[in-house]
């Protein structure tokens, strides 16, 4: 292959992945927390998009600087809502139980859907399915969680790979749940990883120039 990997806090990410078409690494960062002045890193994140899709769907933000975009929640709302293929690749840095990760995701998605009066029985059932998928797993260092969001039909395929095991997959088909899962990583000031938000803003600003 000969493709140079991109290092995100010492975690290698491919600069491009092929789904139905090539998607480029346009955002990278980490989730972390500071404990007693020490930075503890949990995951490294890569966000993959097609630059031509970005130009088509986000042209309204042409001419904005990365700093302007990073502080504009309307921009990130448009990104999450845009009918374009997206892949979010999450690599585990600090080991964690899958159940802990699942609960974080569940709480965020449920609370934000409830805020918008979109949390009904169908959403609850689908979210339980997602939590159940992660429940029994152990996220060793270098395990990979992949979210592959389809362009139009509100479907997300979640993949989980860990050392020595075949990738497991789950299809999520409730558009409200899928949309809010995207926003967990792509929602500007409320995104789970501020460093990823800044990186996406800088990259998309450059693409739109």
From Swiss-Prot:
Catalytic EC class: isomerase
InterPro entries reported for this sequence: Chalcone_isomerase (IPR016087), Chalcone_isomerase_3-sand (IPR016088), Chalcone_isomerase_bundle_sf (IPR016089), Chalcone_isomerase_sf (IPR036298), CHI3-like (IPR044191)
Induction remarks: Induced by PAP1.
Pathway(s) of this molecule: Secondary metabolite biosynthesis; flavonoid biosynthesis
Keywords recorded for this protein, A-Z: Flavonoid biosynthesis, Isomerase
Catalytic activity, EC: 5.5.1.6
Database matches in Pfam families: Chalcone
GO terms assigned for molecular function: chalcone isomerase activity
Biological process terms in GO annotation: flavonoid biosynthetic process
Domain of life: Eukaryota
Catalysed reactions, semicolon-separated: a chalcone = a flavanone
UniProt keyword Isomerase present: yes
Family affiliation: Belongs to the chalcone isomerase family.
Record function comment: Involved in anthocyanin biosynthesis.
Official protein name in the record: Probable chalcone--flavanone isomerase 3
Gene name tied to this protein: CHI3
